[in-house]
């Protein structure tokens, strides 16, 4: 007997480890379903995800504050469509090509180092010398002062001009989005799929999301501290403190790299148990281009329905956030507060609420409702919430615009402007959307994914997880941009009635898609077979299946 065979004979089987993980007698044991031998491999990955999520949460709120301070809320949709979407697609597809000959682990390490260098350079160089790198930051605002462009019908172009003039702020917005998409959503979970078996993934992924939401809570308190320090200090001290925040994010990126390298060298590849023949590690990679992804999506009604659900959610969230962020900026001006400080305070409150409530839902029996009650009980919650949420946000925006005398599609009786109430409703609805993202949209989507034949699963997930989320945001931003052009304004709240109409139509289609998916899911579970992917054209998919 060789040394390796002797070592394996001392290891428990995967089923024995699974039984130990599921047999917790204490509260923590029942919540954190992790066997004793799995604790190191789970703990290090949880720490990595915590730091990745913390950087993403802080950078996301910092970028929103910087954009509202130096640019305009109406600039965000243009950045999403013209900058973030194409750059994100290019980076993701480039990484997929690199992964043909390179491991996910190496790419993850490289990205952490690159972002670490970038964050440090941004805090020390770009923020210190942006007056040299950029044109006069007041140049564009002077062009648009005194409503000169309103009479020319070009007021909406300020949202395009400001990101070009203040390009360092646009770069910060782009980098925060790329960190969230590439490092957080793509590479980390691709790395976990290479390390864990399928049974481990089913237990660990919800727990990883818990640690991600703990990071969200910590970042919420961090943003409150940043806001407090910024309000108390002078302009020079506030600028120095913000530089320090970016440098600390860079240091955190390097810490992630060091923890990951130690984990890879000493823990990740040590055998924990004897893997059963029925189990396998999820190493399948989805190597698809954009056009190929669209063609594959169009060949299956099931994938079209799942993709539409993802797109509908992203469009709805994007449109309500555009209105909400504009309202925050307007309310800050109304009460004489500095816009970036005000945004930090509101965003930190949202983070705390989302993190705490998401953890409660993820640790409760809510994710198991699909199994116990049925698919519709979970999947139908987001579109129902969307209808009431959009009616609240856009309805209040329409009333406030009427009170100010701004033209909308329908006339309303002036009842007095109440931006505080509009902001409060917006914060509640945005919080609800983000909570439902973790606890309902993702849970129902993953339940469907687990019923798809493994031969197609990786390719289909590459479509609705890798492409459709950003595509939905781009569509929502495009709708916002077109409405700004139509109303000759940078305030999308003037289009509240048309926004409500568009989202209502999208949500109705969302509901029909959920009902269709529920029927397919229930049929699959009752017959205990793979879900019917409902092919439109069988021959191309049969060929793809043979290739797989």
UniProtKB/Swiss-Prot annotation:
It is found in: Cell membrane. It comes from the Eukaryota. GO terms for molecular function: ATP binding; ATP:ADP antiporter activity. It is a multi-pass membrane protein. Keywords: ATP-binding, Cell membrane, Glycoprotein, Membrane, Nucleotide-binding, Transmembrane, Transmembrane helix, Transport. Its main location: membrane. GO terms for cellular component: plasma membrane. Pfam families: TLC (PF03219). The chain crosses the membrane at residues 39-59, 75-95, 107-127, 149-169, 171-191, 204-224, 239-259, 302-322, 350-370, 374-394, 410-430, 494-514. Glycans are attached at residues 101, 400, 406, 488. ATP transporter involved in the uptake of ATP from the host cell cytoplasm. Provides the microsporidian cell with host ATP in exchange for ADP. This is an obligate exchange system. This energy acquiring activity is an important component of microsporidian parasitism. Belongs to the ADP/ATP translocase tlc family. This is ADP,ATP carrier protein 1. The lineage of its organism: Eukaryota, Fungi, Fungi incertae sedis, Microsporidia, Nosematidae. The gene is ANC1.
